[in-house]
């Protein structure tokens, strides 16, 4: 199938097969599509509505192009979400990565610089002193030796440069926004994945299962957050080890936590968020701590280190208050200096 044939099919509101989408995405990532073609296809897919097979095929093509790592650990967690919820909150999933690592989880945090917010995971980590120029073998050592590593998306997904201009020109969410959490270069098979689109929660969990993930929670707050919201109930699609997907809702109260106001988790620029992340890992009590405890608890449930959210909160609190989570951040910073 050619790009023109694919575009004609999608414009006619016909779905691409998994194999067709893999081929077309492969052509785009190889630089064989013009920005106009990339933008037209992404727009047509969005207007039609991307199917499970189309997202799966696109993710498989992107995984095939990635610079991969192979951590020694069997259980590896990613907390990467789609971003793009427009809420401009603090980097909750980034903080969760260090808390989970402090609790004993091996974490391969996939992330990028900000797209729609003021500060993405790469921005806050760079402000903290984590190098974005780490060689891949150094990142692999971070994961194996320290239990946490940061996989800077542009370093591992260089082929995305071929679609970058079209994505900037489009200015809206497209299939590309869905792919980051589905294409962890370390092959993490356990995930806490927040999505900006509540309609995609169950679909995304099914795609993860077909991609080989073992367990995952895909979450979307009823208030629109692409996290487990500390401010409201949250929709969850849980991928279980048998491949089944179960949906339910959770609330802060389920974890023994109080609801916090949205302003408690508002984000700032990279320097401000870096200061707040340090304070959080130093044990500061705040609404932000509540948000991180709630999401870290879910991460611990996903990997099997916590029986339920309340148990997860207790273990996340211990990881922070013992200094273990802070030590994980310090190790990542110091590792980039060696």
UniProtKB/Swiss-Prot annotation:
It catalyses: N-(5-phospho-beta-D-ribosyl)anthranilate + diphosphate = 5-phospho-alpha-D-ribose 1-diphosphate + anthranilate. Pathway: Amino-acid biosynthesis; L-tryptophan biosynthesis; L-tryptophan from chorismate: step 2/5. Anthranilate 1 binds at residues 81, 112. Its EC number is 2.4.2.18. One of its GO terms (cellular component) is cytosol. Binds 2 magnesium ions per monomer. Mg(2+) 1 binds at residues 93, 227. It is an enzyme of class 2 (transferase). It holds the Pfam family Glycos_trans_3N. Anthranilate 2 binds at residue 167. Keywords: Amino-acid biosynthesis, Aromatic amino acid biosynthesis, Glycosyltransferase, Magnesium, Metal-binding, Transferase, Tryptophan biosynthesis. Its cofactor is Mg(2+). 5-phospho-alpha-D-ribose 1-diphosphate binds at residues 81, 84-85, 89, 91-94, 109-117, 121. Signal peptide: none annotated. The keyword Methyltransferase does not apply. Mg(2+) 2 binds at residues 226-227. GO terms for molecular function: anthranilate phosphoribosyltransferase activity; magnesium ion binding. One of its GO terms (biological process) is L-tryptophan biosynthetic process. Homodimer. Catalyzes the transfer of the phosphoribosyl group of 5-phosphorylribose-1-pyrophosphate (PRPP) to anthranilate to yield N-(5'-phosphoribosyl)-anthranilate (PRA). HAMAP family: TrpD. Belongs to the anthranilate phosphoribosyltransferase family. This is Anthranilate phosphoribosyltransferase. It comes from Myxococcus xanthus (strain DK1622). The lineage of its organism: Bacteria, Pseudomonadati, Myxococcota, Myxococcia, Myxococcales.
């Amino acid at each position: 199938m050619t790009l023109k044939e694919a575009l004609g099919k999608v414009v006619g509101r016909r779905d691409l097969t998994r194999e067709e989408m893999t081929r077309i995405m492969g052509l785009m990532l190889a630089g064989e599509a013009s920005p106009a073609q990339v933008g037209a296809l992404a727009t047509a897919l969005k207007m039609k509505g991307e199917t499970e097979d189309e997202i799966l095929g696109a993710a498989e093509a992107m995984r095939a192009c990635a610079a991969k790592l192979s951590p020694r650990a069997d259980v590896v967690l990613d907390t990467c979400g789609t971003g793009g919820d427009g809420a401009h909150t603090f980097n909750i999933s980034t903080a969760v990565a260090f808390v989970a690592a402090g609790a004993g989880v091996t974490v391969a945090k996939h992330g990028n610089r900000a797209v729609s917010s003021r500060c993405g995971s790469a921005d806050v980590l760079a402000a903290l002193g984590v190098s974005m120029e780490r060689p891949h073998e150094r990142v692999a050592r971070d994961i194996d030796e320290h239990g946490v590593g940061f996989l800077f998306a542009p370093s591992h997904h260089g082929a995305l440069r071929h679609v970058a201009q079209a994505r900037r020109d489009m200015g809206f969410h497209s299939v590309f926004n869905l792919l980051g959490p589905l294409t962890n270069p370390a092959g993490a098979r356990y995930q806490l994945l927040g999505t900006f689109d509540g309609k995609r929660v169950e679909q995304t969990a099914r795609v993860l299962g077909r991609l080989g993930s073992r367990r995952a929670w895909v979450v979307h707050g009823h208030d629109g957050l692409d996290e487990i919201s500390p401010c409201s109930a949250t929709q969850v699609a849980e991928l279980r080890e048998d491949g089944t997907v179960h949906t339910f809702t959770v609330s802060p109260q389920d974890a023994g936590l109080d609801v916090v106001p949205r302003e408690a988790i508002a984000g700032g620029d990279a320097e401000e968020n870096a200061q707040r992340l340090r304070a959080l890992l130093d044990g500061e009590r705040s609404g932000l701590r509540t948000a991180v405890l709630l999401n870290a608890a879910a991460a611990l449930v996903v990997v099997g280190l916590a029986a339920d959210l309340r148990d997860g909160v207790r273990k996340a609190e211990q990881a922070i208050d013992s200094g273990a989570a802070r030590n994980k951040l310090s190790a990542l910073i110091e590792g980039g200096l060696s």
